Structures are given as structure tokens and as C-alpha cells.
Amino acid sequence: MDRYFFLQDATTVAKLLLGNLLIRKIDKEEIVTRIVETEAYMGITDSACHSYGGKITNRTSAMYRIGGYSYVYIIYGMHYMFNVVTADKNNPQAVLIRSVEPISPLLGEKSILTNGPGKLTKFLNIDLTFNKVDLIGNNELFLQRGLNLDFNIVCSKRININYAQESDINKLWRFYIKDNKFVSRR
């Protein structure tokens, strides 16, 4: 996937990432997963987004990079969240990867290991060392075009954003592959 792909807005990229591969290389082994659920965070005008109002902190500074970088942060002191930065530099939008489907051989039907944003980062061993990483050309964590992009997409409200303004809570900016058993919530 090239830089241009990630320069689009977060809602566009969130839909386009579905069905594509998130690959983590540990030692010499590749763990291949298929992205099945995402959420878009639209930057300074989205009260559910960490960069709402133009907020820049050490944590949110990753969102101000050019599209194609990672934004990893920790919640509840124990769960890492993996996001893909989108749009132009200083237009802080991102896509949260909520769930993935394991594809690598020997991984089997372990949906309980990857059916949520904290679970997938644990499964793929993604932590803060992967914050602000350029996902284009990286050989430890990267995205790749999927082979089967023929599926229906469900749009729904984002999860756990009750702190946001009602208008943002009601936006249908969560996307997932219909009938995929690895989705965190239906």
C-alpha cells in the first residue's frame, strides 16, 4: 500500500482497510491477519477523537504525522490500541483497527484472541514501541492488499465514546465485514 492510499480521510480509509492484511513479523515468522473491523476518527472537529479541537500532546502527536504512520496508545493502563494515521500532515485523523481475522497457518479459529482492539494488539505483540512507525516499508509491522475484497460492509456507531458530543456519538463511523465471526460486536 502506498502513501497516497493513506492520504484520504479517515472514513474512506476505514472502509478501504477492511479485507486488507495487517502483518506482524516477529523474529523470522510472519503473523498474517485480515482486517475485519475499523472505526474512523475525523480529527479536530470530531469530539470522540483525541485530537479534537486541535489538541496536541505527547500522546496525540502521532496523529499529526502524514497518513501511513501508526498511532499506538494505552488505555486502562493495560490495553494497547493500534491506529493508522490518515490524511495530510497536521490534519490529525486516524483509523482504529478494532478486530482482525487470523490468516496464518496454525492459527486456526481463535476469534477470541483477535476480536477486539486490545486483544489484537496482545496477539500481534504491538506495544508503544510501534507508535509513530511508518507502516510503508516497515518490515516488522505493515499493511498489504488483501486477496478477497468481495464482501458487504456494515456501518454502525462507534463503541465506548460516551464522552463525545451526541452528534458525534451518533455518526456511523464504525465499519465491519458483514457476518464475519471475528468482529468484536454486532
UniProtKB/Swiss-Prot annotation:
InterPro entries: Formyl_transferase-like_C_sf (IPR011034), MPG (IPR003180), MPG_sf (IPR036995). Its EC number is 3.2.2.-. It holds the Pfam family Pur_DNA_glyco. Keywords: DNA damage, DNA repair, Hydrolase. The keyword Hydrolase applies. GO terms for molecular function: alkylbase DNA N-glycosylase activity; DNA binding. SUPFAM superfamilies: FMT C-terminal domain-like (SSF50486). Belongs to the DNA glycosylase MPG family. PANTHER family: DNA-3-METHYLADENINE GLYCOSYLASE. This is Putative 3-methyladenine DNA glycosylase. It comes from Borreliella burgdorferi (strain ATCC 35210 / DSM 4680 / CIP 102532 / B31) (Borrelia burgdorferi).
